[in-house]
Amino acid sequence: MRRINPNKLELEERVVAVNRVAKVVKGGRRLRFSALVVVGDKNGHVGFGTGKAQEVPEAIRKAIEDAKKNLIEVPIVGTTIPHEVIGHFGAGEIILKPASEGTGVIAGGPARAVLELAGISDILSKSIGSNTPINMVRATFDGLKQLKRAEDVAKLRGKTVEELLG
């Protein structure tokens, strides 16, 4: 998979979660903050990243840098996705279904941020199992990575799109 250059895209960021984490040492607890951020150009490119630091803004900055390194391209057909798909990560699972125009983004929390920043404006989704923000984001990314356009599948099979769709 080729890397996407984040400098050529106008990326928008969205903070999905900020957590206070503690490391217990002999003298007490060492507190730090971890941040989960999703970035996207609302035109088929989206990425997520995590960052950890002693201050919240620094954790968010690190997460944004990380997210720009993990960009993926999402195939979009009109305003929705090409086909139904199920994304898995850990105990989290998400079902993504294409929706007719005007439906809007029907998704909960972390998945909504990913789908909106990817540029998908009509989609139905249902999250099952673990609802931890990081697991939901990773499961959504797993689902989005599985998506393929009809043209790509036809090319792989050596057929025309008409032959595939019958």
Curated annotation (Swiss-Prot):
Keywords for the protein's UniProt record, in alphabetical order: Antibiotic resistance, Ribonucleoprotein, Ribosomal protein, RNA-binding, rRNA-binding
Gene: rpsE
Family classification: Belongs to the universal ribosomal protein uS5 family.
Task performed by this protein: With S4 and S12 plays an important role in translational accuracy.
GO biological process: response to antibiotic; translation
Domain S5 DRBM: 11-74
Name the record gives this protein: Small ribosomal subunit protein uS5
Alphabetized InterPro entries for the sequence: Ribosomal_Su5_D2-typ_SF, Ribosomal_uS5, Ribosomal_uS5_bac-type, Ribosomal_uS5_C, Ribosomal_uS5_N, Ribosomal_uS5_N_CS, Ribsml_uS5_D2-typ_fold_subgr
One Pfam family named in its UniProt record: Ribosomal_S5_C
GO MF terms held by the record: rRNA binding; structural constituent of ribosome
Comment text on domains: The N-terminal domain interacts with the head of the 30S subunit; the C-terminal domain interacts with the body and contacts protein S4. The interaction surface between S4 and S5 is involved in control of translational fidelity.
Gene Ontology cellular component annotations, sorted alphabetically: small ribosomal subunit
SUPFAM superfamilies (UniProt xref): dsRNA-binding domain-like, Ribosomal protein S5 domain 2-like
Subunit details: Part of the 30S ribosomal subunit. Contacts proteins S4 and S8.
